[in-house]
């Protein structure tokens, strides 16, 4: 079993020496270039991170001066130079505090909730107005169609009445010319009311 496993290892080693460890495709040719705005944000964040690191190193220096020499070497097994240990919880806490300021975050959520409520109420109100407008438009359209039909009927009745009056005038003028002229003079002499 040892011989077969050593042969298999030798075969694998030979196989890996033949293959190239570099990728067959250059991934940089498919990379999407980073916009300048994002690069600026990243550089600003890294500068603010450097500032916070300098504050932490200042704190470490103050702590180093405050602790006696024996206290600094208490945790190291060797008598070599003391290396400051990383406080993970403090680092995570500081990172979270920098990333999310709780007051600003709650204000943003509150503002977003209020804005969402206003948008929802206005969209509901707009939908109601659209529905009311559709109903009113159909009512006005129906009234207009009825009004145009009534106007056509009235126009036809006026034409019919005008024709009848002209026929009656012609008949009265020929049958009773004296009375017709007297009545006509009375009508023309009658004063017209301005109101």
From Swiss-Prot:
It is found in: Endosome. Residues 44-56 have a biased composition (Low complexity). Component of the biogenesis of lysosome-related organelles complex-1 (BLOC-1). GO terms for cellular component: BLOC-1 complex; endosome. Residues 1-80 are annotated as: Disordered. Residues 19-30 have a biased composition (Polar residues). This is Biogenesis of lysosome-related organelles complex 1 subunit KXD1. Its main location: other. GO terms for biological process: endosome organization; regulation of protein localization. Component of the biogenesis of lysosome-related organelles complex-1 (BLOC-1) involved in endosomal cargo sorting. It comes from Zygosaccharomyces rouxii (strain ATCC 2623 / CBS 732 / NBRC 1130 / NCYC 568 / NRRL Y-229). Belongs to the KXD1 family. Keywords: Endosome, Transport.
């Amino acid at each position: 079993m040892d011989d077969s496993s050593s042969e298999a290892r030798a075969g694998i080693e030979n196989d890996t020496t033949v293959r190239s460890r570099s990728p067959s495709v250059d991934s940089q040719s498919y990379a999407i270039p980073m916009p300048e705005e994002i690069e600026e944000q990243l550089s600003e964040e890294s500068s603010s991170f450097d500032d916070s690191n300098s504050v932490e190193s200042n704190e470490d220096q103050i702590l180093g001066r405050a602790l006696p020499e024996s206290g600094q070497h208490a945790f190291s097994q060797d008598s070599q130079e003391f290396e400051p240990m990383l406080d993970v919880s403090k680092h995570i806490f500081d990172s979270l505090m920098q990333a999310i300021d709780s007051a600003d975050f709650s204000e943003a959520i509150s503002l977003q909730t209020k804005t969402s409520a206003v948008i929802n109420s206005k969209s509901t109100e707009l939908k109601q107005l659209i529905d009311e407008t559709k109903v009113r438009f159909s009512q006005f359209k129906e009234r207009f169609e009825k009004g145009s039909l009534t106007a056509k009927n009235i126009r036809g009745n006026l034409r019919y009445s005008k024709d009848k009056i002209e026929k009656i005038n012609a008949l009265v003028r020929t049958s009773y010319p004296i009375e017709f002229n007297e009545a006509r003079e009375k009508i023309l002499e009658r004063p017209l009311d301005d109101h």
